[in-house]
């Protein structure tokens, strides 16, 4: 389960907290507003002696889920999965609730390992107005992953990554259906095979990605594409 879970909660400020070894999403917020976290340390990959945790495969670090006005700053996250995953529910349940994640600010943070700051892939309520600014990514496989697979529905929009730097010398993860590169937008996330020319009807399960801005980004990486669209 989650190590910290906030649900239907507003006006929370957390500071100088260290959380480790969550078997699932580490710090998860759902249906919350006005959450601020300052100088938070999250580690779902290594213990305090540098030994790797075993058996953690979906250990997202920080996860606002159908939340608004969430602020994460001056924090360190080391993850075996997404360091940050902005979500808004999944499939029929997420579309029924229809609460987007919006007005998310992630600034002056340091991310180590994992897959950087992700939008989706659970995004049935929509994700919009997210800023990731002045962050460093060390041995992370990506800065930005925008995952909107067909079938999830809703829209990921007004997402900005600005003044971020990635240096990755870790070659343990190869390009796959789960990972494409340092900056990637993927409407076929998780699919083993797909035909981009195949017709699929447009409806409530059709996912949309639009208005994504990448500005002043530096990349040095050994695995995956630099940019994948």
Located regions from the model:
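Extracellular/periplasmic carbohydrate-active domains that bind, remodel
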Residues: 1-229
């Amino acid at each position: 389960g989650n190590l910290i879970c906030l649900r239907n909660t507003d006006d929370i400020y957390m500071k100088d907290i260290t959380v480790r070894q969550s078997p699932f999403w580490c710090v998860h917020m759902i249906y919350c507003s006005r959450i601020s976290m300052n100088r938070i340390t999250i580690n779902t990959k290594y213990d305090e002696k540098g030994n790797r945790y075993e058996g953690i495969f979906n250990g997202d670090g920080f996860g606002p889920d159908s939340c608004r006005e969430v602020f994460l700053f001056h924090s360190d996250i080391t993850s075996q999965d997404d360091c940050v995953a902005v979500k808004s529910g999944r499939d029929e349940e997420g579309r029924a609730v229809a609460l987007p994640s919006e007005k998310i600010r992630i600034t002056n943070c340091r991310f180590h390992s994992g897959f950087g700051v992700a939008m989706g892939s659970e995004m049935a309520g929509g994700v919009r107005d997210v800023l990731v600014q002045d962050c460093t990514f060390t041995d992370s496989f990506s800065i930005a992953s925008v995952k909107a697979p067909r079938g999830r529905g809703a829209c990921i929009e007004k997402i900005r990554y600005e003044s971020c730097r990635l240096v990755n010398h870790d070659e343990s993860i190869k390009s796959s259906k789960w990972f494409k590169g340092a900056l990637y937008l993927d409407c076929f996330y998780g699919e083993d095979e797909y035909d981009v020319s195949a017709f699929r009807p447009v409806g409530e399960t059709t996912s949309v990605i639009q208005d994504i801005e990448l500005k002043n980004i530096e990349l040095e990486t050994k695995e995956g594409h630099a940019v994948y669209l």
